[in-house]
Amino acid sequence: MGIRAIVVDTAGTTTDLNFIQDVLFPYSVKALPDFLEQNQHNVLVENCICDTKDIALEPEADLARVTEILQQWVNEDRKATPLKTLQGLIWKQGYAHGEFKGHIFPDFIEAVKRFSTQNLRIYSFSSGSVDAQKLLFSHSDGGDLTEMFNGHFDTRTGNKLDKQAYCNILNTISLSPKQVLFVSDVIEELKAADAAGMMTCQMVRDSKQRTGDFRKISSFDELQIE
C-alpha cells in the first residue's frame, strides 16, 4: 500500500518554536488592542469577540476586557479558535508590512520539494489557524511554499491531542490510516495519531526533548519514503 501522504506539525517540526513564541505571539499581544478597536465591526472579528465572551463566560465583557482575556490566552498558549483566528488576521498584516518572515527549517524546505517529486501529498496540522499556516508558508524565508501543500488543518478539525482529529483528517483526504504518515515533535499528538491508525514519526530537534516509543528523526533529511 505504502505512504501516500505526509501530515506535518508546524511548531517544533517545520518551524522553530522560538519563532512562534518570541516573534509571532508577542506581536499579536501588542497588536490586539488597536486591531480590535479598528476592526470590531468586521463580521469575522465581531464573531471572534462574541465567541471569546462565550468561552470566558463573560457575556457582558466590554472590548477592553475581551482584549485582556485574549492577551491572557496568548500567555497561557490557549488553543481557543477565536484567538487563533484573530492571531491569523493580525499576522497577515505583519507579513504584509514586512515586519517578519515565516521561519521554516531548511531541511523541510528541501524535503517538501523532494516529496512533491515523489507524488506524495503534503498537509499541515496546527493549532494555528489555516490562514496563519498559509501565511507562514507563503512568506517563508525559503520563499512561497504553498504550492507544495495539498491542504491545511487547524482546531476546527479537532484537538491535536484527540484521536478523533486524526480520524477527521483521514476522512477528509480519503486515505486509509496506513497510507498517511504524521510527523510531530509532541508525544501526545503522536499517540493520538497512532490511536487513529496513522503511521507516526517523532521529530527530535532538541537533545533535551521528551521522546517516546516512536520512530525518530532529527531532520527531514533523514525521512526517506520508499
From Swiss-Prot:
UniProt entry tagged with the keyword Amino-acid biosynthesis: yes
Its EC number(s): 3.1.3.77
Keyword Hydrolase belongs to the record: yes
Record-linked InterPro entries: Enolase-ppase_E1, HAD-like_sf, HAD-SF_hydro_IA, HAD_sf
An MF annotation (GO) of this entry: magnesium ion binding
Keywords, sorted A to Z: Amino-acid biosynthesis, Hydrolase, Magnesium, Metal-binding, Methionine biosynthesis
GO biological process, one term: L-methionine salvage from methylthioadenosine
Pathway: Amino-acid biosynthesis; L-methionine biosynthesis via salvage pathway; L-methionine from S-methyl-5-thio-alpha-D-ribose 1-phosphate: step 3/6; Amino-acid biosynthesis; L-methionine biosynthesis via salvage pathway; L-methionine from S-methyl-5-thio-alpha-D-ribose 1-phosphate: step 4/6
NCBIfam families: enolase-ppase (TIGR01691), HAD-SF-IA-v1 (TIGR01549)
HAMAP family, per the entry: Salvage_MtnC (MF_01681)
Subunit (UniProt): Monomer.
Role, per record: Bifunctional enzyme that catalyzes the enolization of 2,3-diketo-5-methylthiopentyl-1-phosphate (DK-MTP-1-P) into the intermediate 2-hydroxy-3-keto-5-methylthiopentenyl-1-phosphate (HK-MTPenyl-1-P), which is then dephosphorylated to form the acireductone 1,2-dihydroxy-3-keto-5-methylthiopentene (DHK-MTPene).
Name of protein: Enolase-phosphatase E1
Record lineage: Bacteria, Pseudomonadati, Pseudomonadota, Gammaproteobacteria, Alteromonadales
Gene that encodes the chain: mtnC
